[in-house]
């Protein structure tokens, strides 16, 4: 299976780091769950959310420094049949990997893959030769508090791509 990533979100470190990120799972420090996000680069950080979905991140910083990009959306370019078998409720090919949980499900990524090297089998990352495309930036999807504001325009997507997920602001929580 091959996927062209069309949307990501960046997440950085704990409150006491040089780059504190209130929207990050690492903001309150290292835990057993978020340990893979502290490196090394090129490894997966996978978490289970809402008791339903897996979401996959690729760690970006050196060992000991929390940073990762959440893989938010992609286009299945090879292996559509396998993706459909994993996501039979998909309404169209562009829907197969539009959103972080759909993308992880299409790829068959689970928390069992957290900490694995994304550059080694069965995974693989490559930067194919292609023309430059327009990239848009804005606030992250569904992140509450300061980390979900325009002060953190760390969501990046290929402008106009039909597989990019819809923007949804976080719901305001009342105490």
What residue ranges belong to the model's regions?
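Conserved, well-structured core segments that form or line functional sites
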Residues: 1-175
């Amino acid at each position: 299976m091959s996927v062209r990533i069309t949307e990501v979100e960046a997440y950085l470190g704990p409150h006491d780091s040089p780059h504190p990120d209130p929207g990050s799972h690492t903001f309150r420090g290292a835990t057993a769950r978020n340990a893979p996000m502290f490196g090394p680069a090129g490894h997966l950080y996978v978490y289970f959310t809402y008791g339903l979905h897996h979401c996959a991140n690729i760690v970006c910083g050196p060992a000991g420094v929390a940073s990762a990009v959440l893989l938010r959306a992609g286009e299945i370019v090879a292996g559509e049949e396998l993706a459909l078998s994993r996501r039979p409720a998909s309404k169209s090919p562009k829907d197969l990997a539009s959103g972080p949980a759909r993308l992880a499900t299409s790829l068959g990524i689970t928390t069992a893959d957290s900490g694995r090297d994304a550059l080694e089998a069965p995974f693989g990352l490559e930067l194919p030769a292609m023309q430059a495309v327009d990239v848009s930036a804005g606030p992250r999807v569904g992140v509450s508090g300061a980390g979900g504001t325009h002060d953190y325009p760390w969501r990046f997507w290929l402008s106009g791509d039909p597989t990019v997920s819809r923007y949804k602001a976080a719901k305001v929580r009342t105490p």
